[in-house]
Design a protein with these regions (language model features):
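Residue-level detector of structured alpha->beta connecting loops
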Residues: 17, 39, 149, 169-170, ...
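Conserved acidic residues
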Residues: 10, 19, 43, 83, ...
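Short hydrophobic/charged patches on amphipathic alpha-helices used for structural packing
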Residues: 10, 77, 89, 162, ...
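Conserved AMP-binding/adenylation subdomain of ANL enzymes
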Residues: 109-126, 133-224, 228
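Conserved AMP-binding A3 loop
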Residues: 86-112
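Conserved pre-ATP/AMP-binding loop-to-beta segment of ANL
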Residues: 47, 52, 67-90, 97, ...
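Structural core segment of the AMP-binding/adenylate-forming
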Residues: 1-63
Length: 234
């Protein structure tokens, strides 16, 4: 979380016994403070940007290219324990210290598989990443998109949400219930303003009844509303 206070960042690094920290220059002050404090086990600092004082991601990438095929093959042949600890996620910790959720690669892949069993995501779908990737649901949703071969676009901000959905012709959207409720309320506000509430509510009942009989006319019935959301949203 880029907005994490320094104290929580330090505590998380201590509790996780992290040895490597990847950061960007925006958080350089916090990194310098961590190095000076020497309260964590972090011994390797990797900067995502070019830096005279730290190893950069570009530098590591360059070294990897120079290592040669033999070194790459050795790395790729390393044994993987799918059920060993691979990820520690700290919860929000609103009432006390953040709880550390311990996950394995098996847990993560199982989540991706389960989501694909619940919802159909296809190659060619377009997703909009709205939740940050340090948000577990946001990160898992992105892994689902990669697994399915779907494209991912990025929202320009909450005020541009509807504009981006239309502009990018979004077909799949992973988000929290609160955001869906906000979109629904906004749609219903427009429906009431245009005097179409009774017509829409009747359409909802009719389409629900027909759906039970295996007839789906929702996209035709609510085309005008769906067009306001880009026309592709499922």
């Amino acid at each position: 979380d880029k907005g994490l206070p320094y104290e929580e960042l330090e505590t998380s690094l201590v509790r996780s016994e992290a040895e490597v920290l990847i950061f960007d220059t925006e958080h350089l002050a916090a990194v310098e403070q961590l190095r000076a404090a020497q309260t964590t086990k972090v011994s390797t600092f990797i900067c995502m940007d070019a830096s005279a004082d730290y190893v950069s991601v570009a530098q590591l990438r360059s070294e990897a290219k120079q290592a040669g095929e033999a070194e790459l093959a050795r790395y790729q042949a390393l044994p993987i324990d799918a059920k060993a600890l691979a990820l520690i996620i700290f919860t929000s910790g609103t009432t006390s210290l953040a709880k550390a959720v311990m996950l394995s690669q098996y847990n993560i892949v199982e989540n991706v598989y389960a989501l694909q069993c619940c919802e159909n995501v296809y190659r060619g779908d377009v997703n909009m990443a709205f939740l940050p990737y340090h948000h577990t649901f946001g990160a898992t949703g992105q892994l689902v998109m990669l697994a399915a071969g779907a494209a991912t676009t990025y929202c320009d901000g909450l005020k541009y949400l509807q504009k981006n959905i239309v502009e990018y012709r979004i077909s799949v959207f992973f988000c929290v219930p609160l955001l869906i409720e906000a979109i629904y309320k906004r749609i219903m506000m427009t429906v009431k303003k245009e005097g179409l509430e009774r017509k829409v509510r009747f359409g909802l009942k009719l389409s629900g009844l027909l759906l039970r009989c295996g007839i789906d006319i929702r996209r035709k019935l609510f085309k005008q509303i769906l067009d306001q959301l880009g026309g592709n949203l499922r």
